[in-house]
């Protein structure tokens, strides 16, 4: 049997853990996703970051172009059909009511825009901070996005 130890004295010293240093070395995403995850600037070379940003930007730009063309065609075609129907006498548009509704919508938008200014400012600040921290990836994304729009 193992020998019992007597309780130690009150003068026993304890090791103090510095949690700030621990937090710097062990990011929260390391616990979630593993040791190999982390910010792009810590993981990949500059060339890899540019390529990753460029490829994802090109994909986003290409999809934006295709969806934009489809949406523009749908909206333009709808207006064209409305004009043809109006010209043919199938429908009649009450332009005074349209003007009244447009003015009402303008007033509502102005009223709502004044309320949401602080939220927009914080969104802009967060976006600016993100772009500054990830300037290489952001630059690659913008370049790829423009190339995707052009292709």
Curated annotation (Swiss-Prot):
Keyword Kinase part of the UniProt annotation: no
Keywords associated with the record: Autophagy, Membrane, Mitochondrion, Mitochondrion outer membrane, Transmembrane, Transmembrane helix
Top-level taxon of the source organism: Eukaryota
Disulphide linkage map: none
GO biological process: autophagy of mitochondrion; response to hypoxia
Gene Ontology cellular component terms for the protein in this record: mitochondrial outer membrane
Chloroplast listed as a keyword: no
Listed transmembrane segments: 44-64, 71-91, 130-150
Compartments, record wording: Mitochondrion outer membrane
Entry similarity comment: Belongs to the FUN14 family.
PANTHER family membership: FUN14 DOMAIN CONTAINING, FUN14 DOMAIN-CONTAINING PROTEIN 1
Function: Acts as an activator of hypoxia-induced mitophagy, an important mechanism for mitochondrial quality control.
Name this protein carries in UniProt: FUN14 domain-containing protein 1
Native source organism of the sequence: Xenopus tropicalis
């Amino acid at each position: 049997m193992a020998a019992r130890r007597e309780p130690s004295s009150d003068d026993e010293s304890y090791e103090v853990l510095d949690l700030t240093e621990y937090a710097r070395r062990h990011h929260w995403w390391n616990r979630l996703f593993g040791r190999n995850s982390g910010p792009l600037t810590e993981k990949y070379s500059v060339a890899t970051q540019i390529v990753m940003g460029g490829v994802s930007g090109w994909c986003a730009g290409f999809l934006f172009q295709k969806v934009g063309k489809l949406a523009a065609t749908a909206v333009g075609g709808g207006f064209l059909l409305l004009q043809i129907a109006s010209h043919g006498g199938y429908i009649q548009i009450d332009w005074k009511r349209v003007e009244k509704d447009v003015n009402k919508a303008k007033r509502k938008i102005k009223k709502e825009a004044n309320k949401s200014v602080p939220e927009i400012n914080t969104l802009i600040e967060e976006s600016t901070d993100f772009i500054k921290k990830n300037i290489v990836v952001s630059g690659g994304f913008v370049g790829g996005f423009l190339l995707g729009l052009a292709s």
